Amino acid sequence: MASYSCCLALLALAWHSSAYGPDQRAQKKGDIILGGLFPIHFGVAAKDQDLKSRPESVECIRYNFRGFRWLQAMIFAIEEINSSPSLLPNMTLGYRIFDTCNTVSKALEATLSFVAQNKIDSLNLDEFCNCSEHIPSTIAVVGATGSGVSTAVANLLGLFYIPQVSYASSSRLLSNKNQYKSFLRTIPNDEHQATAMADIIEYFRWNWVGTIAADDDYGRPGIEKFREEAEERDICIDFSELISQYSDEEEIQQVVEVIQNSTAKVIVVFSSGPDLEPLIKEIVRRNITGRIWLASEAWASSSLIAMPEYFHVVGGTIGFGLKAGQIPGFREFLQKVHPRKSVHNGFAKEFWEETFNCHLQEGAKGPLPVDTFVRSHEEGGNRLLNSSTAFRPLCTGDENINSVETPYMDYEHLRISYNVYLAVYSIAHALQDIYTCLPGRGLFTNGSCADIKKVEAWQVLKHLRHLNFTNNMGEQVTFDECGDLVGNYSIINWHLSPEDGSIVFKEVGYYNVYAKKGERLFINEEKILWSGFSREVPFSNCSRDCQAGTRKGIIEGEPTCCFECVECPDGEYSGETDASACDKCPDDFWSNENHTSCIAKEIEFLAWTEPFGIALTLFAVLGIFLTAFVLGVFIKFRNTPIVKATNRELSYLLLFSLLCCFSSSLFFIGEPQDWTCRLRQPAFGISFVLCISCILVKTNRVLLVFEAKIPTSFHRKWWGLNLQFLLVFLCTFMQILICIIWLYTAPPSSYRNHELEDEIIFITCHEGSLMALGSLIGYTCLLAAICFFFAFKSRKLPENFNEAKFITFSMLIFFIVWISFIPAYASTYGKFVSAVEVIAILAASFGLLACIFFNKVYIILFKPSRNTIEEVRSSTAAHAFKVAARATLRRPNISRKRSSSLGGSTGSIPSSSISSKSNSEDRFPQPERQKQQQPLSLTQQEQQQQPLTLHPQQQQQPQQPRCKQKVIFGSGTVTFSLSFDEPQKNAMAHRNSMRQNSLEAQRSNDTLGRHQALLPLQCADADSEMTIQETGLQGPMVGDHQPEMESSDEMSPALVMSTSRSFVISGGGSSVTENVLHS
């Protein structure tokens, strides 16, 4: 059985040796062997395997100069390690390197060789197989290049835990350690690259792109990751196509049609150079220009694509390049390559022939079967050296490698080459860790260490996973848990060299995966040259950018990147282009006209400085000065009768309340503050209640005094000055109590109202409780209504120049103002609410001030002759006569007595009319006294005295039905006209009614006189005689002051003039006694 296994292994090796001859591998012995997989050729010749004969190994074609340079980097690193005294001393590293021809099949053939040798060593069959030469196991493999190739190799090597360190396979699928257990790499995976691509598109504000990916394990995962990143950034993908170097012409044509018809100008390509080359050739043939190609690192510097004849199509490409490294001495090592000197490198012979287009085999004739290209994979490059079919000359061996420009000597940027160099050193440092391991500190069971002389592949894999060393550039090298080596990218831009017309790769930025999100990408836009040699960033959006002040609106049925620009609504703004939504302005701000920003809202209130506020302030100040002026006048003329008659103390309090009313209006002007809001309504309410309470007490007092028939002690007691102030206090205290409850439970406060108008903030007062405000105003209106009732009832009383009448007018004005205030207050808003209330307060205050005080001030200042006690008493007397006459004539049943001298016949009550007519000129210097016939009935209490004849001796005319008499009273003249119409006395007596009466009296400024007077009226008819006789005078109703104390300062004129006079009116055979109360 052992012999059988040995023979199978030998057969596998023999078959592999036939497939890979000496010229198709590089091999060198050593204590430890490293395997290598490099794409020395770009592909294999297509053959139709019809299986009619034994299948032959496929032939590799199209030489890859960069692939050979990567192989040289591995050899250089191994030789440098072998010569190092500090790294793996006393040990030699060997290598076995094979050409993968950039295909999975060739790579698996080479991998099978590594696995088979390791299997033979693990079986220890040398003694049975009788092998002539022992070949050590391959403890690690460097490679492969493409992700698709590495995926196939990793599946096979993973079965035997042989570590694989790739230098160019970046597919993120290879990070799956459950499937690829032994895979590691010195290149970042495509996850970071896909993120970087999305960041670049977002940076240039593109949102409409197309994607193309290689149909393998490199392109599909890479473009899938890009889609995820693009979706997070609202980047839309117009088309997504897969390509391959093996795609037929029809498939390529379809992809080109899609690209040509698409409106996307940016195309993201995750592919290698060989897979992309057929597509680019067709695009060049069709001359499709104006596209921006975003290249992954696999073809970002590929010479297959970066050809001068393609520049009008691919010029301006933005790509990712791996971080370039430095390998000291590597350039000289590359220049030393020679077929005769590189005995361990079977690929050197073909490299020499392809470089100098010659052949080393003497006598070789005939055309070469294939064209010779210079081409690279993933780092790329393609140059046609010779497509001629002529005979190649013999190589002399003296050719100079520096005389020919090939990608092999492109030493400017060592990216993949440096990754190869780093992969070799990673394996060497893992071996070094094994070599220097101390028992008890190892990575294996119980801290044991591996034997460096018998080291196995899985032990090397263990140490690679825990690797940590510093490279020649001073950077820390370590593999993460996924076996990846995190690195950065360079951003390159394709330019056309002005020197030789070739395409050069200019570094225009970088991508730092270690930086925090948002700061990873840096691009210098000034260095970028776009397609068509333009410096302006191309446009690749489904819709035009929405300018500031607008937002993107979704179009139904279209991708989210295809939108229409919608203007931001009022109150919202967008300060940047392509805003997905408009931002709402803060509460105190509003959008400007273009909706590009927010501006502070206009703050509006009834300000002191605005014309309306100034006008109201002036009116309020005017009211305050007028009130103060009136108060000053009253204080100065406090001892005059008209001031005394108004109850000085109560008038002072009333004027003070009016001052408060005018002043309270000022709290409604200016910016509302919490304290002004809490003060203005109570100040207004309390001031008006105080004012109305004073008026109410004055009005009610006058009414009660004039309605009283006989003054009693009740009036003197309850209408004293102290009680009047007490009533004012009680009425005002109720309002104060309402305000205290209001301020305690729900105090008003300033409020910034944003809802009334969009662009204006109205600073107003929030009243806190509408119920409390209603109670305050309601109580004020209730007192005003009561005051109006009493004032209206006493409007005809003569007290103090018809003060009750003016109070009635003032209350009427008060109600008109506040009734008008209610709809105006409800229909206004903002600052006009305060203005309406100020106007109402001022109007009501001016009405009260004018109606109650202006007439008195006018008399005091301009009519001092009327500011006398006599004037006051004369008005009282006139009122008394009118009351007496009306009371007599309206009495329904009159006691009729006839004088014995006139006979006992029953008289009838004539239809009479009494009128009074004032005549200031008709006066007599001295009244004439005549004996008149005594009245039929006299008041028994009055003193006996001779009646005063009030008219001169007149000639009687008995035939006249009407007589007129002039009655002289003091210095005034009163004319009474009494007419009688009694054609039938009996009929008139039965009618018992009066037809008409009138009385006109003129008051004079002379002394009214304080005496009893008999006022007889005699006509020609003896039966028609009417006599008015004052029968008594009673003293003041209130207080202890006597009527004679006229000059006393302490005496109230209103109280002095309050008297009760008793009159007997007789005539026509009847008499009536009437008590008249007048003031």
Swiss-Prot record:
Region span, Intracellular loop 3 (ICL3): 790-805
Electron transport among keywords: no
Span list, region Ligand-binding 1 (LB1): 22-188
GO CC terms of this entry: apical plasma membrane; axon; axon terminus; basolateral plasma membrane; cell surface; glutamatergic synapse; neuronal cell body; plasma membrane
Binding-site residues, Ca(2+): 81, 84, 87-88, 100, 145, 170, 188, 190, 231, 234, 297, 489, 557
Residues recorded with modification Phosphothreonine: 888
CDD domains, alphabetized: 7tmC_CaSR (cd15282), PBP1_CaSR (cd06364)
Assembly notes: Homodimer; disulfide-linked. Interacts with VCP. Interacts with ARRB1.
Positions of the UniProt region annotated as Interaction with RNF19A: 880-900
Gene: Casr
UniProt-annotated stretches for the region Ligand-binding 2 (LB2): 189-324
PTM annotation, UniProt: Phosphorylation at Thr-888 by PKC impairs coupling with G(q)/G(11) G-proteins, while it does not affect G(i)/G(o)-coupling. Phosphorylation at Ser-899 by PKA promote plasma membrane localization. Ubiquitinated by RNF19A; which induces proteasomal degradation.
Functional note: G-protein-coupled receptor that senses changes in the extracellular concentration of calcium ions and plays a key role in maintaining calcium homeostasis. Senses fluctuations in the circulating calcium concentration: activated by elevated circulating calcium, leading to decreased parathyroid hormone (PTH) secretion in parathyroid glands. In kidneys, acts as a key regulator of renal tubular calcium resorption. Ligand binding causes a conformation change that triggers signaling via guanine nucleotide-binding proteins (G-proteins) and modulates the activity of downstream effectors.
Record organism: Rattus norvegicus
Record-given protein name: Extracellular calcium-sensing receptor
Record's compositionally biased regions (Low complexity): 900-918, 932-961
Main subcellular localisation: membrane
Transmembrane segments: 611-636, 649-668, 675-698, 723-745, 770-789, 806-828, 833-854
